[in-house]
Regions:
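Signal-peptide-cleaved, periplasmic/extracellular N-terminal interaction regions immediately downstream
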Residues: 2-253, 258
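Soluble periplasmic/extracytoplasmic beta-strand elements of cell-envelope proteins
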Residues: 45-49, 66-72, 96-100, 108-112, ...
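Active-site-adjacent mobile loop/cap segments within catalytic or ligand-binding domains
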Residues: 56, 344, 395-481
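Short connector loops/turns at beta-strand edges and beta->alpha or beta->beta junctions
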Residues: 74-76, 265-269, 343, 451-455
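Conserved NTP-handling cores and scaffolds of large molecular machines
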Residues: 75, 117, 142, 296, ...
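Short acidic, glycine/proline-rich loop/turn micro-motifs
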Residues: 81, 271-278, 456-462
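Catalytic-core regions of hydrolytic enzymes
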Residues: 190-200, 210-389, 400-410, 473
Length: 481
């Protein structure tokens, strides 16, 4: 009996110690592991990564515009203080921020804003290399219109791009344009200016702004999601009537613009594949996309000027559905998604081109790769509670047989040109799988895996400027065929 009582006391003491440790763990709260800021014209994202889920409340304040975020259950840490230095002068939305211990176990971050924003605040569960993430996305009250962005870019380039219609020869390997009478001095994108000036229907009212006197500072404010980024597409631009005396042949060469949507994969929180020497896919494909954009903007097809539109032009994350929406908004004629993926073994090598499949993947490797790419939203971070995210997913279910057939032709032309620069091909024909980013119903769409970044030799090639230039040349010729 005495031994049994001693054993019971030992167990009780052990339980008390375990309980005390549990209380200590709860009192300690979450540990902040890292903070990141991703500024972009579309929106600015602030990510706070921790070893446990964070609870937060937020308050929007006007005059001047500010956003206060209270993070509960933590103490101010050096990692959180790093946020102050991560705000860049060129951030479109954040002018600066302050961070401090607002109350015991409550850290407050106050964002001083350059303009009124519509914030989305949500949590992401651990995935890939990330632990728990608290995400703050700051959107403008009026969503960025991709068509207006394309117009603005065209206007910026106008002083140095006046002779783009005759510059096909600027692309390596492309034949010089034949001599022809000068076309009318018009910019096909210019006609869109008037169309964009008058939008159908009244603009959506901005979300309510709560001042400090209207609501206690410790209470959360219901946040209205930003308006959808895609509005009703305007009619395809056409040139004004040709002056008397000009031939019909000349007029027909300037009656429209050919828009190519370039989609550099991944970005922001999502680095994509990482090579053995640390090369990040998101960086390489953005560089290739910029080089290809230069070639497209300097080219024409049968006299019709070409224009490239990038779904992202900097290091920020764009959800898969939004990439498709952007391409449709600018009425793209082609969609080219650029990647440089990895495989489970470094022996995998060679470039590949993929089109959409409605009836299963053409190979097990294609299926594996499609599943991997379709998980990009999980790593990049999508607010699944946002209604617009559901709308975007619905958009991706309307692919057509005609679109797929045209995509296969485009992909075949690109494969031939990539082989022509001496690059190794992983497969000699266009493969097919259910890539979500290729599901625009009305745009021929391909996904180009430029190489396997997991292969040391191909990783080194992808880092070389001359290789990127040759690759951009090959893709350009494939587009023009």
């Amino acid at each position: 009996m005495k031994g049994r009582g001693l054993k019971r006391r030992v167990l009780l003491q052990g339980g008390s110690i375990a309980l005390m440790l549990g209380v200590h763990q709860i009192a300690r709260g979450a540990t902040i592991l890292a903070v990141r800021v991703w500024p972009a014209a579309d929106y600015t994202r602030v990510t706070i990564e921790s070893d446990a889920r964070l609870s937060s409340q937020q308050l929007v304040v006007g005059s001047p515009p500010r956003l206060a975020v209270d993070i509960e259950g933590i103490e101010l840490s050096p990692e959180l203080r790093e946020l102050v230095g991560k705000i860049k002068p060129g951030d479109p939305y954040i002018n600066g921020l302050r961070v401090g211990q607002n109350a015991p176990k409550v850290v407050r971050i106050v964002f001083d804003l350059k303009q009124a924003v519509v914030p989305q605040v949500f949590s992401l569960a651990p995935v890939a290399a990330y632990k728990h993430r608290l995400v703050l996305d700051l959107y403008p009250e009026q969503a960025i219109d991709p068509m207006e962005a394309l117009i603005a870019e065209r206007l910026r380039d106008a002083p140095r791009g006046g002779n783009s219609n005759n510059s096909s020869a600027a692309v390596a390997g492309a034949p010089p344009a034949p001599a022809r009478p000068a076309p009318p001095a018009v910019d096909p994108l210019g006609d869109l200016m008037a169309q964009q000036a008058v939008r159908p229907g009244p603009p959506a009212p901005p979300p309510p702004v709560v001042t400090g006197s209207e609501r206690p500072t410790g209470l959360p404010v219901p946040l209205t999601p930003p308006p959808p980024a895609v509005a009703a597409a305007p009619a395809r631009p056409v040139a004004p009537p040709v002056a008397a005396g000009r031939g019909d042949a000349t007029a027909s060469r300037t009656d429209r613009i050919i828009i190519v949507a370039l989609d550099p994969g991944h970005g922001g929180e999502d680095p994509g594949a990482i090579g053995p020497n640390g090369t990040r896919e998101k960086d390489i494909v953005l560089q290739v996309a910029h080089r290809l954009r230069e070639r497209i903007n300097a080219s024409s097809v049968n006299g019709s000027p070409m224009r490239a539109f990038l779904t992202r032009d900097a290091d920020f994350f764009v959800p898969l559905g939004v990439r498709v929406q952007k391409a449709r908004r600018v009425q793209a004629d082609l969609f080219v998604s650029i990647h440089a993926d990895a495989f489970t073994t470094p022996a995998a090598r060679g470039a590949s081109v993929f089109a959409l499949s409605q009836s299963g993947a053409s190979s097990s490797a294609a299926r594996w790769l499609a599943n991997k790419e379709n998980d990009a939203d999980k790593v990049g971070g999508v607010n699944v509670g946002n209604h617009e995210a559901q709308v975007q997913r619905a958009l991706l279910d309307m692919s057509t047989t005609a679109q797929i057939n045209d995509s296969l032709k485009l992909g075949g032309a690109m494969l031939g040109e990539i082989k022509g620069i001496g690059a190794r091909l992983h497969k000699g024909q266009v493969e097919q799988a259910g890539f979500a980013v290729l599901k625009a119903p009305d745009i021929p769409s391909v996904l180009v895996e430029t190489a396997f970044i997991s292969n040391p030799e191909e990783e080194a090639n992808l880092r070389r400027v001359d290789y990127q230039e040759n690759l951009a040349d090959a893709l350009m010729r494939g587009i023009q065929r």
